[in-house]
């Protein structure tokens, strides 16, 4: 099939030769393009106007090519030239043959013919050129002249030839010294690289860029700077007599090819060091800092003593009286001139003073989104926190805010012991006893160090044998039949067939997640489309898919697959697909009707994540449009009526589980310290109650570890007077082998107590639990709009959560639930249900997705629980400032591109800016590193060594560039696992970052963007990140460390940051972490002018009348060690003197 036939077939959607021939006949019969379009439209075949033009133009192009080819065939001379080209250079192109023939006819001699071909870099050697000229004898050439008008070269080709001729005429005959040329890296060696130089008429013009001339910084390996085949700009610095050319890449802008101005500033210029990491880009060069008053005084003294020169400090010339005795200079002619006779130009001084002034940046409050001017809620605060408690001033909420004294005391006790042990180590190291064996001394020091590392409870836990929970010898088919859901298989299948929407309620461990998808597949539902199942967490999606693949008997990615962010393990044969709810939400962006699926199951719907809530509305809409689509909602809670009501009052099916009565015991009075009360309750149960294990719900890792340590010490103190008590922790950060211990049967005569987070409410089921201790608190994630962060805070749980915790005690037999709060608090201070995530989290990414789907009226969107209006307005304002929304609130072209990336809008904004700034390769790498967990790890027994290794990766400009250093060096080490072990890096996290980078690169390729490297230019990378994170900027404050410009929140640099202990005037942060105070995480220094350049709509330069300067307070110097901070005042000094002399006023 010809190219034109393939094109027509692709447009009409058929490979039928009869249809293609029919279309070709219409083209032949049509006199012109307009007639052809009319004939096509009469057919009503659904072919667009643009496709009609494409077909017609392709047909005409093919005809022109055939004409040229026929002319070549009909001309004996053309055939001979074509044969020579075919034999000598393996080229069989009639257009090239006609082109060579036209040059031959215009040339008066062989010399002129040879020059013309060489000028155009035709690649033909002299022997081939001579052969062609010999073929055309003079009589034949004259004969061909008459034929020439009928064999005209097409106009486009002729214009291109003229353009090439002009380019060739402008080329240098040979390389010119100190001129910059474009080149291509041909070969890389240990001492540099060889570059093919373009822009000269010489063939194969090569030169060497020595390793010392490859970068302004010191280069250890040429591969760090260039790669083979890369196009670069080079300067010719030397041409030897033997023709060898030396090249340089130093001080050359690799984007424009311009020579940068050499940095001639003194290295010792007031501490302004010529840092190896500093960019030479003069456009982004850091301006000189203005001198402070103490510095001015000190410099004036140095100049007066002759130790410094006034010429080094031009800004002080107008302040210092010039003394002719030491400020005399010689003119070029040898005459002496006094320093006070020549004055600096006033305009120049003023310009220099302007340059040294620091830029003061403040918010631009005048420019806001016009479409939100009338939308502000009356009486609502701009940064109002989401309401997550029923009674904010209630006793439970006050207990949550104040925290536990027991935890605080335990923390302080550990710190005191640590200091004592450190003091003993120092004493042992300083005391050199000559009678003592040095080996014994070293062992004593090591024993003391080990006490610093682990507590008694941790040491006991380390000595336990590692196991992986309960094992079973049953075959997989028998295991499936033991699950509670198996007995309801036929009822479930029939319910799915009869209803479009279905709600299934089943306890954790009933088998609903792994079995229902298989039942539907076995019953043939997958014949009409995939069976999809969403999970709220990535780990769950991957692990469940692997388990189901094992049960089905296939490899993951074939019949059963999974999709999580930046990882798609599915294939064309996949029938059952597990995925995170966020990934299905992204699929809805491209396919709103979910046409690939026959059944979609929203698992763990009771968790009410933001993505799940959005999917409720999207799937409800898709199912109404597609009656054959089935939607199943599964939940582990009994409160399922709300789901049923939302999905058009659909049926609810309960999977029965083993449930026994549970006795609820409330506290008689409010507990002052819920941790102390929980520990006392555990001891009381262990001593006074019958057999059965205990489950205690706590809020997080620190509480769990502290409780385990305190309880271990108390049980050890009681000794044999009580039975054996096994203490087990459960939280997500624990290794899986330690977590799995909770599932092992308790040894006879013992009791186990499990301290767990709310993961034990629904996600896991522990057999043997008869007693539940519920303090009534949990950590909840909320969005703090003022700080622009999501933070975990301790808050009272809801009544639904309390009932779910109670139910954990009734799985094995009749149980008891000890609620460490009053019955009044349960009914009066707890909300009925937990506040859904969509009502307490940042919605910027969610709203961007909805806007990309064409949903502009968000107030009318069918949310199950609509988010607060102020939360939506904050998200819309953020998107407007990121330029993804226009003045009418509609998605811009930039916003459409941002929605294609599965990441936060700030990251996608930086990513797209990197394309314009030509540093996309580095930005993709850094974003990949930010998308994974912390790549550094600090083993407790080797913390100093780990910190030392980490410091080697530190970049002086901050953490974003530090992460780039880590990935680049790991890449240079060939992605070695051993390299990670040596440098205390998480190999698994780095491997994940590499996968994420690969996925982002694929998205880049898919949408036609290029990955370009800027060779780690720090200024370019930092400025690119500012384009996305300009709202996360902070300015140094002399009293509190830093204050965010947007919101004025007092923050500090996190101790793990590479900038910790350093002071930059302006910094940018990725997020804020709330621990003992609010810390900026992933911090990078920036220049204030960048904020004004990339976000003039958000920031403006401050002046004398600006609000920030008006509010600024002059705070006097003080001695932070002095008891009386007013001791420096004159009045204080006078009073002290009077007291000493006994004078009374």
From Swiss-Prot:
Motif DEAH box location, chain numbering: 603-606
Name of the encoding gene: PRP22
Protein name: Pre-mRNA-splicing factor ATP-dependent RNA helicase PRP22
Protein family membership: Belongs to the DEAD box helicase family. DEAH subfamily. DDX8/PRP22 sub-subfamily.
Principal cellular location given in the protein's record: nucleus
Entry's EC annotation: 3.6.4.13
Limits of the Helicase C-terminal domain: 678-854
GO cellular component, one term: U2-type post-spliceosomal complex
Alphabetical keyword list: ATP-binding, Helicase, Hydrolase, mRNA processing, mRNA splicing, Nucleotide-binding, Nucleus
Domain S1 motif, chain residue ranges per copy: 178-250
Organism lineage string: Eukaryota, Fungi, Dikarya, Ascomycota, Saccharomycotina
Source organism superkingdom: Eukaryota
InterPro entries membership: DEAD-box_helicase_OB_fold (IPR011709), DEAD/DEAH_box_helicase_dom (IPR011545), DHX8/Prp22_DEXHc (IPR044762), DHX8_GH2-like (IPR049588), DNA/RNA_helicase_DEAH_CS (IPR002464), HA2_WH (IPR048333), Helicase-assoc_dom (IPR007502), Helicase_ATP-bd (IPR014001)
Domain named Helicase ATP-binding: residues: 493-656
Role played: Acts late in the splicing of pre-mRNA. Mediates the release of the spliced mRNA from spliceosomes.
Subcellular location: Nucleus
Any GO MF annotation of the entry: ATP hydrolysis activity
UniProt biased composition (Basic and acidic residues): 254-278
Chain segments carrying region Disordered: 254-281, 421-442
Binding site for ATP: 506-513
């Amino acid at each position: 099939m010809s190219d034109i036939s393939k094109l027509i077939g692709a447009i009409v959607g058929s490979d039928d030769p009869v249809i293609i021939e029919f279309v070709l006949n219409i083209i032949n019969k049509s006199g012109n393009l307009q007639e052809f379009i009319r004939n096509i439209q009469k057919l009503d075949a659904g072919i667009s106007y643009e496709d009609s033009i494409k077909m017609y133009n392709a047909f005409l192009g093919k005809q022109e090519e055939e004409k040229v080819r026929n002319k070549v065939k009909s001309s004996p001379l053309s055939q001979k030239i074509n044969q020579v080209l075919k034999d000598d250079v393996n080229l069989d192109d009639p257009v090239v043959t006609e082109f060579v023939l036209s040059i031959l006819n215009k040339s008066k001699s062989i010399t002129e013919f040879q020059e013309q071909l060489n000028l155009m870099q035709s690649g033909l050697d002299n022997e081939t050129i001579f052969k062609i000229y010999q073929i055309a004898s003079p009589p034949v050439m004259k004969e061909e002249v008459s034929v020439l008008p009928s064999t005209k070269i097409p106009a486009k080709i002729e214009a291109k030839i003229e353009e090439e001729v002009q380019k060739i005429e402008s080329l240098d005959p040979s390389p010119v010294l100190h001129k910059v040329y474009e080149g291509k890296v041909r070969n890389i060696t240990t001492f540099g690289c060889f570059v093919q130089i373009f822009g000269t008429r010489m063939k194969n013009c090569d030169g060497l860029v020595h390793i010392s001339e490859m970068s302004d910084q010191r280069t250890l390996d040429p591969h760090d700077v260039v790669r083979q085949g890369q196009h670069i700009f080079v300067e010719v610095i030397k041409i030897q007599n033997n023709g060898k050319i030396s090249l340089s890449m130093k001080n050359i802008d690799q984007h424009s090819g311009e020579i940068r101005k050499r940095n001639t500033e003194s290295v010792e210029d007031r501490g302004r060091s010529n840092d190896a990491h500093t960019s030479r880009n003069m456009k982004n060069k850091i301006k000189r800092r203005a001198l402070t008053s103490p510095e001015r005084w000190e410099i004036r003294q140095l100049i007066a003593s002759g130790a410094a020169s006034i010429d080094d400090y031009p800004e002080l010339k107008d302040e210092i009286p010039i003394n002719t005795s030491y400020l005399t200079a010689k003119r070029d002619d040898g005459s002496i001139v006094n320093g006070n006779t020549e004055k600096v130009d006033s305009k120049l001084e003023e310009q220099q003073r302007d340059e040294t002034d620091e830029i003061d940046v403040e918010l631009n409050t005048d420019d806001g989104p016009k479409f939100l001017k009338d939308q502000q809620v009356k009486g609502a605060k701009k940064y109002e926190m989401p309401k997550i408690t029923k009674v904010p001033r209630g006793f439970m909420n006050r207990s949550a805010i104040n925290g536990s004294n027991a935890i605080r005391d335990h923390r302080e006790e550990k710190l005191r012991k640590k200091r004592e042990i450190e003091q003993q180590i120092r004493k042992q190291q300083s005391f050199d006893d000559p009678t003592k064996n040095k080996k014994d001394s070293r062992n004593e020091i090591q024993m003391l160090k080990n006490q610093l590392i682990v507590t008694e409870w941790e040491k006991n836990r380390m000595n336990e044998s590692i196991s992986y929970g309960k094992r079973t010898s049953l075959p997989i088919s028998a295991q499936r039949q033991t699950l509670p859901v198996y007995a309801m298989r036929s009822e479930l299948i029939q319910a799915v067939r009869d209803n479009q929407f279905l709600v299934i309620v089943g306890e954790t461990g009933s088998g609903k997640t792994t079995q229902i998808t298989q039942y539907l597949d076995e019953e043939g539902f997958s014949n009409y489309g995939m069976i999809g199942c969403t999970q709220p967490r990535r780990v769950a999606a991957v692990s469940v898919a692997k388990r189901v693949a094992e049960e089905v008997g296939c490899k993951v990615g074939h019949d059963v697959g999974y999709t999580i962010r930046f990882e798609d393990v599915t294939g064309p044969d996949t029938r059952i697909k597990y995925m995170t709810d966020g990934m299905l939400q992204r699929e809805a962006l491209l396919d709103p009707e979910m046409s690939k699926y026959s059944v979609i199951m929203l698992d763990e719907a009771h968790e009410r994540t933001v993505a799940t809530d959005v999917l409720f509305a999207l799937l409800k809409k898709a199912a109404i449009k597609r009656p054959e689509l089935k939607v199943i909602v599964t939940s582990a809670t009994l409160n399922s009526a709300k789901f049923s009501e939302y999905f058009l009052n659909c049926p609810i099916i309960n999977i029965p589980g083993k449930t026994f009565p549970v006795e609820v015991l409330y506290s008689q009075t409010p507990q002052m310290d819920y941790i102390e009360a929980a520990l006392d309750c555990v001891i009381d149960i262990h001593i006074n109650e019958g057999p059965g294990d205990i489950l205690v719900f706590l809020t997080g890792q620190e509480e769990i570890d502290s409780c385990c340590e305190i309880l271990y010490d108390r049980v050890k103190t009681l000794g044999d007077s009580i039975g054996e008590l096994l203490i087990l922790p459960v939280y997500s950060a624990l290794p899986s082998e330690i977590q799995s211990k909770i599932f092992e049967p308790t040894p006879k005569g013992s009791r186990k107590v499990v301290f767990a987070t709310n993961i034990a409410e629904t996600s896991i089921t522990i057999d043997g639990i008869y007693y539940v201790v519920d303090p009534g608190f949990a950590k909840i994630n909320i969005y703090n709009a003022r700080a622009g962060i999501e933070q975990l805070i301790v808050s009272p749980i809801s009544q639904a959560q309390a009932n779910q915790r109670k139910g954990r005690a009734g799985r094995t037999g009749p149980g008891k639930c000890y609620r460490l709060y009053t019955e009044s608090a349960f009914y009066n201070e707890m909300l009925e249900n937990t506040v859904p995530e969509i009502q307490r989290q940042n919605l910027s990414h969610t709203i961007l997705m909805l806007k990309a789907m064409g949903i502009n009226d968000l107030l009318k969107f069918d949310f199950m629980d609509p988010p607060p209006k102020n939360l939506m307005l904050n998200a819309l304002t953020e998107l407007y400032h990121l330029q993804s929304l226009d003045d009418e609130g509609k998605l811009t072209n930039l916003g459409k591109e941002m929605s294609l990336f599965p990441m936060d809008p700030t990251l996608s904004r930086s990513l797209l800016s990197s394309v314009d700034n030509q540093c996309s390769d580095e930005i993709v790498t850094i974003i990949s590193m930010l998308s994974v967990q912390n790549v550094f790890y600090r083993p407790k027994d080797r913390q100093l060594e780990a910190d030392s290794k980490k410091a080697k990766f530190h970049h002086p400009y901050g953490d974003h560039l530090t992460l780039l250093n880590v990935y680049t060096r790991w890449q240079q080490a060939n992605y070695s696992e051993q390299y990670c072990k040596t440098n205390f890096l998480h190999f698994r996290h780095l491997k994940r970052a590499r996968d994420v980078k690969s996925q982002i690169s694929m998205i880049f390729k898919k949408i036609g963007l290029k990955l370009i490297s800027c060779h780690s230019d720090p200024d370019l990378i930092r400025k690119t990140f500012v384009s996305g994170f300009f709202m996360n900027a902070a300015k140094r404050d002399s009293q509190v460390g830093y204050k965010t410009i947007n919101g004025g929140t007092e923050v500090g640099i996190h101790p793990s940051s590479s900038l910790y202990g350093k002071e930059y005037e302006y910094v940018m942060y990725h997020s804020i972490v709330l621990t003992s105070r609010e810390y900026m995480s992933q911090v990078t220094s920036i220049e204030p002018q960048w904020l004004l350049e990339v976000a003039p709509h958000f920031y403006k330069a401050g002046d004398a009348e600006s609000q920030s300067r008006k509010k600024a307070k002059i705070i006097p110097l003080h001695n932070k060690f002095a008891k009386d901070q007013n001791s420096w005042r004159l009045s204080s000094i006078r009073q002290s003197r009077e007291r000493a002399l006994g004078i009374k006023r």
